[in-house]
């Protein structure tokens, strides 16, 4: 390297404030999103976010800044943050830089692609609406997911979001034979290790990739790990022509990391302290999730709702991108109904007769009506007792209670905890079971016989299981 090129590629640290680092370059300024390296062994990675003037840039450190000092040399790599792509990354676990964190050797012969990419143009996108069948009764029946769409799992802490996501991975591999990519944003180290071991024990690790920006890592790492996972998903969709299930846990922590960066960059906060660019940043991630003529990326995103407040700006902005929303209820979880999805608070734009068919559409409306009427009658039952209802209302309550129990389901990923073998149920079997319950074919069966089963044919075998 000649002297001129050396001076052109190197700058000096001018200022350090937490994870925000200002760097001075004498001859040129690196473009936005360029990765800079500094530190004793170039272990500190900085992404350029803005150019302050003709000599200074301001960037966010994607690693810890311990050991940095003013006037330290900074290398302009000339490249953006990149992620490895290729079939060799299957069954592996990576960090935001594409480095293995599963104690294995780096995968050989991978291609590296920049994580900052444009969404597919409208001309390449498929306009056909297709249902993505999950094998989970309450989702496929009442809130069907869209192939190439985005679904949100809304709920507070401890209601089963992560368990539901891991079950989706299992069913994706066994039902659709596609690729699953799990992106952990702000995940606890323990949860990542448990997921890795669960997927390995379930035999689905060979068809999935895991990418983590862990809770203890700087906000820059948590803010970019979603783009790294999405870049990997785009490879399987566009180059391998496969369907991809992208699971993000938790999209709120992506927004939270952006809020931390915004504060450190000195931006004026908006409502409730969120960054003013939250809508734009979320759109840059969400708009790349789409289906094309060659494949589809279907995304399911866990959304932590602060204090269970669905008017929180993070929840509101996320809602606008979703084709389906699955709301997990703490009350239902407390009553033992798992998955704890609230059928009256969840919904999907796919529930139209032109998409799911008239039979499915009419049945879903009838079930919602029965469950809504039962919800209204609960206060009367609590005050006066079931005997004070009319005969017709008592029949309605019995149907609703049987439907609630039938829509529970044992999961493969929780077999070791529940002792009940997991079930994957087809949509036709779910529709058939609900229609038979509404026709009172199981009026003489105890409610417990319908609790935690797959198809209604198992009702006789499950009489010993006690429902809540």
Curated annotation (Swiss-Prot):
Highest taxon above the source species: Bacteria
UniProt xrefs under Pfam families: ATP-synt_ab (PF00006), ATP-synt_ab_N (PF02874), ATP-synt_VA_C (PF22919)
InterPro entries named among the record's database cross-references: AAA+_ATPase, Alt_ATPase_F1_bsu, ATP-synt_VA_C, ATP_synth_F1_bsu, ATPase_a/bsu_AS, ATPase_alpha/beta_chains, ATPase_F1/V1/A1_a/bsu_N, ATPase_F1/V1/A1_a/bsu_N_sf
EC number: 7.1.2.2
Gene Ontology molecular function, alphabetical: ATP binding; ATP hydrolysis activity; proton-transporting ATP synthase activity, rotational mechanism; proton-transporting ATPase activity, rotational mechanism
Reactions mediated catalytically: ATP + H2O + 4 H(+)(in) = ADP + phosphate + 5 H(+)(out)
Enzyme class: translocase
Binding positions (ATP): 155-162
Protein's cellular compartments: Cell inner membrane
Membrane topology, as annotated: Peripheral membrane protein
Function: Produces ATP from ADP in the presence of a proton gradient across the membrane. The catalytic sites are hosted primarily by the beta subunits.
Protein family: Belongs to the ATPase alpha/beta chains family.
Subunit and partners: F-type ATPases have 2 components, CF(1) - the catalytic core - and CF(0) - the membrane proton channel. CF(1) has five subunits: alpha(3), beta(3), gamma(1), delta(1), epsilon(1). CF(0) has four main subunits: a(1), b(1), b'(1) and c(9-12).
Name by which UniProt lists this protein: ATP synthase subunit beta 2
Gene: atpD2
């Amino acid at each position: 390297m000649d002297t001129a090129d050396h001076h052109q590629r190197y700058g000096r640290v001018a200022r350090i404030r937490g994870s925000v680092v200002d760097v001075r370059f004498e001859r040129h300024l690196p473009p936005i999103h360029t990765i800079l390296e500094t530190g004793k062994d170039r272990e500190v990675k900085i992404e350029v976010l803005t150019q302050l003037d003709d000599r200074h840039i301001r960037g966010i450190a994607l690693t810890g800044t311990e050991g940095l000092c003013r006037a330290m040399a900074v290398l302009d790599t000339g490249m953006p943050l990149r992620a490895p792509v290729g079939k060799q990354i299957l069954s592996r676990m990576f960090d935001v830089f594409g480095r293995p964190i599963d104690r294995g050797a780096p995968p050989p012969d991978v291609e590296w692609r920049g994580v900052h990419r444009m969404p597919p143009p409208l001309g390449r996108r498929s306009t056909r609406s297709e249902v993505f069948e999950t094998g989970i009764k309450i989702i496929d029946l009442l809130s069907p997911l869209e192939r190439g769409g985005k679904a949100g799992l809304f709920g507070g802490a401890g209601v089963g979001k992560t368990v539901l996501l891991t079950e989706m991975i299992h069913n994706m591999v066994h039902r659709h034979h596609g690729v699953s990519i799990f992106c952990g944003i702000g995940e606890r180290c323990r949860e990542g290790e448990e997921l890795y071991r669960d997927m390995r024990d379930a035999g689905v690790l060979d068809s999935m990739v895991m990418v983590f920006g862990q809770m203890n890592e700087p906000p820059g790492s948590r803010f970019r790990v979603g783009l790294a996972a999405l870049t990997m998903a785009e490879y399987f969709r566009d180059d391998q022509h496969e369907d991809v299930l992208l699971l993000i846990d938790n999209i709120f922590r992506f927004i939270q990391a952006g809020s931390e960066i915004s504060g450190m960059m000195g931006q004026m906060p908006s409502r409730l302290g969120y960054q003013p660019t939250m809508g734009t940043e979320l759109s840059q991630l969400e708009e790349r999730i789409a289906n094309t003529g060659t494949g589809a990326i279907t995304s399911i995103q866990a959304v932590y709702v602060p204090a269970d407040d669905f008017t929180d700006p993070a929840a509101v902005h996320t809602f606008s991108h979703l084709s389906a929303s699955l709301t997990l209820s703490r009350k239902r979880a407390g009553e033992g109904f798992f998955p704890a999805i609230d059928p009256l608070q969840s919904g999907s734009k796919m529930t139209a007769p032109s998409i799911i068919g008239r039979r499915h559409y009419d049945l879903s409306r009838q079930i919602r009506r029965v469950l809504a009427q039962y919800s209204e009658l609960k206060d009367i039952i609590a005050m006066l007792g079931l005997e004070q209802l009319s005969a017709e209302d008592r029949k309605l309550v019995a149907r609703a209670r049987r439907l609630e129990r039938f829509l529970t389901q044992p999961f493969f990923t929780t077999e070791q905890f529940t002792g009940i073998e997991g079930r994957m149920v087809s949509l036709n079997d779910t529709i058939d079971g609900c229609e038979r319950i509404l026709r009172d074919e199981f009026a003489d069966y105890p409610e417990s016989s319908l609790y935690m089963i797959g198809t209604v044919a198992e009702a006789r075998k499950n009489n010993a299981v006690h429902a809540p």
